[in-house]
């Protein structure tokens, strides 16, 4: 990721898709990730209700750390390439910068008081669309509406989604959304 920023600052044009392929090939060649966590870490209930926060759904330790560089408050650390990110929820202010920077789309933002989610998205979605809130398996957990699409120069979009049916701590089970009219029908065999 840092190399891509340097190239852009130098004014050199590079195809973003080519960069992603090269980045994936490099990461794949350097490691064999091991599962470190069974479930992502979350803040305690009191902290979760106090202000926005992020959850890094990184369960495997490998050489990836853009989230730690992205955090302007130093709230995300990795002690080695074989560990997962650790979020200091005392320092995390819920700015969501790490959500934009995660190449694995594994960082998710939450504001439980406002019942809002900040979810990375790589497909076209419009503000105002009604969505199904889903878990990592694509199973429907609830309903929401896309309030805003946040754009950053690195080509990762973050959708600010207002939950209409899920409240408080249950929001942290949500890992994405599917526009209602694009939700696939179950296959019958």
Residue ranges of predicted features:
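Short, structured interface segments
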Residues: 4-10, 87, 95-111
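C-type cytochrome heme c attachment motif
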Residues: 66-73, 93-101
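Ferredoxin-like iron-sulfur electron-transfer modules
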Residues: 14-27, 39-63, 74-94, 109-124
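Intrinsically disordered, low-complexity, charged/polar segments
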Residues: 171-189
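Short, solvent-exposed secondary-structure boundary/capping segments
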Residues: 152-164
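A generic structural signal for residues embedded in beta-strands
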Residues: 132-134
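Short beta-strand-centered aromatic/proline hotspots
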Residues: 139-152
């Amino acid at each position: 990721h840092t190399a891509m920023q340097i190239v852009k600052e130098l004014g050199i044009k590079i195809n973003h898709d080519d960069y992603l392929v090269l980045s994936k090939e490099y990461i794949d060649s350097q490691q064999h990730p091991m599962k470190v966590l069974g479930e992502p870490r979350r803040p305690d209930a009191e902290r979760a209700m106090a202000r926005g926060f992020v959850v890094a759904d990184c369960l495997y330790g490998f050489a990836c750390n853009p989230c730690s560089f992205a955090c302007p408050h130093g709230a995300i650390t990795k002690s080695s390439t074989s560990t997962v990110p650790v979020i200091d929820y005392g320092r995390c202010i819920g700015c969501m910068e790490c959500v934009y920077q995660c190449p694995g789309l594994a960082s998710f933002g939450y504001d439980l008081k406002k019942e809002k989610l900040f979810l990375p998205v790589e497909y076209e979605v419009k503000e105002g669309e009604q969505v199904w809130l889903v878990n990592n398996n694509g199973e429907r957990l609830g309903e929401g509406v896309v309030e805003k699409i946040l754009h950053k120069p690195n080509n990762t979009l973050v959708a600010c989604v207002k939950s209409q049916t899920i409240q408080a701590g249950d929001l942290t089970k949500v890992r994405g959304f599917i526009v209602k009219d694009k939700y696939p029908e179950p296959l019958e065999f």
